[in-house]
Every structure is written in structure tokens, then in C-alpha cells.
């Protein structure tokens, strides 16, 4: 009570994080070696699966919320799994003829937890609701994995906000959008950035709203936009 609350979001319904974050928090403790030791233990696997099959108000159970059909391993590097990058856990499991929970654990163990993922659990209705909230900070939340496929938000977050939600859908004004991308998050974090004032850093970005176009997508995410 009494604490100022803000939040941030980016304009995609698909999220991205590390695949290891699918595990319940208590099974992530101790670092990579400890996690891999648990994943190599059949009893621990059963305990993890038992937790993941239940809704939780203690942690964000993405497996239960999204399902393995909507969880994709976006970066895979080992000989065993490298060719499956970009496929869903369910699809990979099908090709190995095994339960998707075991496929998840096998991937994490083989790749030593160095895997990024994509998942879809939001809706456009959710997006519009939060975009209109005055507490929203507009961000990219970019993760730069070593190889594999980035989330298109890395290259497309800000131009998509400006094209889809300012120019096309007119959810908010260009002034409000730029403020939520620059000065507002800077103020929340206490950084002297984001405004055109004497003595401030000259980090100025010029763009043509009518000419803005987003080229990054999930198949070809590493594409610059045009118009900036």
C-alpha cells in the first residue's frame, strides 16, 4: 500500500524468455549444474511434472497457461537438437516419440539450459487494455541469444507501436506514444533522459510516421524497419 506502481509492455502477443523458466522456481535453484542434476534424476522429473500439470498462484506456470503446442524452442545449439530450432516442444516431442515433458527436460539437460523460447498466452484485447493504461511504459524487452532466431521485438517493437497503435488503430497520439517510449520510463528509473532540453543528451531519433514499416517477423526476425 502506498507504493507507486508502473508496468511495461511491448506490442506482441507472443512472449520470450529462457526455456529453463518453465520449471517451477524451487527446481531452478542452485545454478545450471544443480538444475541439470535434477533433470537427470527420474524422481525429480516426476516431481517437476506433477507441479507443472497444476494451475499455480505461486509462479507463472507457462506450461499450463500456453500448452506445449504454443511453446517454441527458438535457439538450440547441440547436435541432437540444433535442427529443431523454431519448432514447438510438442512437435519436437512427436518426432522423438515421447512425452513433451520429457522432451522439455531432455532439451534443457542436453543444452545445459542455454535455450530461449517463445510462447503465446495473451490476446489483442489484453494488449489494447494495457496500452491504454496511463501507467504503461512502452519497451522492447529484447533478448539477444547467441544464434538461433530472435523474437521480432528486438528489431520491431518501437516501429510496430508507432505503426499499428498510433498510425493505424489510433489507440493514442504520437506525442503520448513517444513519451511512453522515452521520458516516462526514464523518469520511472530516475535517468536524466528522454526530453529535448538544454543540457540533456542529444539522443534524437528522426522518423517519418507515414513511411514507417516493420519487416521483422517470426520467420525472419533480424530485419531492420524502414522510416527511421
Predicted regions and their residues:
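Short, well-structured alpha-helical segments that form the helix of a local strand-helix-strand
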Residues: 101-108, 174-182, 200
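Flexible, glycine/threonine-enriched loop-and-boundary segments that flank and lead into catalytic domains
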Residues: 116-125, 187-195, 214-220
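C-terminal cap of metal-dependent C-N hydrolases
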Residues: 41, 129-135, 140-141, 205-228
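Feature captures the catalytic cores and cofactor-binding loops of soluble hydro-lyases/lyases
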Residues: 159-171, 180, 209-220
Amino acid at each position: 500500500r502506498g507504493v507507486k506502481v508502473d508496468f511495461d509492455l511491448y506490442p506482441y502477443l507472443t512472449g520470450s524468455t529462457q526455456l529453463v523458466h518453465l520449471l517451477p522456481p524451487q527446481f531452478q535453484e542452485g545454478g545450471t549444474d544443480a538444475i541439470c542434476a535434477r533433470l537427470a534424476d527420474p524422481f525429480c522429473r516426476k516431481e517437476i511434472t506433477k507441479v507443472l500439470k497444476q494451475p499455480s498462484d505461486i509462479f507463472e506456470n507457462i506450461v499450463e497457461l500456453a500448452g506445449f503446442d504454443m511453446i517454441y524452442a527458438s535457439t538450440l545449439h547441440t547436435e541432437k537438437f540444433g535442427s529443431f530450432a523454431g519448432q514447438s516442444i510438442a512437435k519436437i516431442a512427436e518426432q522423438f516419440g515421447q512425452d513433451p515433458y520429457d522432451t522439455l527436460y531432455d532439451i534443457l539437460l542436453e543444452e545445459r539450459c542455454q535455450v530461449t523460447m517463445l510462447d503465446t498466452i495473451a490476446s489483442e484485447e489484453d494488449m489494447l487494455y494495457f496500452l491504454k493504461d496511463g501507467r504503461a511504459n512502452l519497451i522492447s524487452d529484447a533478448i539477444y541469444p547467441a544464434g538461433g532466431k530472435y523474437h521480432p521485438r528486438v528489431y520491431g517493437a518501437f516501429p510496430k507501436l508507432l505503426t499499428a497503435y498510433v498510425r493505424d488503430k489510433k489507440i493514442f497520439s504520437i506525442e503520448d506514444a513517444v513519451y511512453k517510449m522515452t521520458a516516462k520510463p526514464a523518469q520511472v528509473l530516475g535517468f536524466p533522459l528522454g526530453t529535448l532540453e538544454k543540457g540533456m543528451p542529444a539522443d534524437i531519433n528522426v522518423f517519418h510516421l507515414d513511411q514507417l514499416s516493420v519487416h521483422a517477423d517470426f520467420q525472419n526476425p533480424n530485419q531492420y524497419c524502414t522510416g527511421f
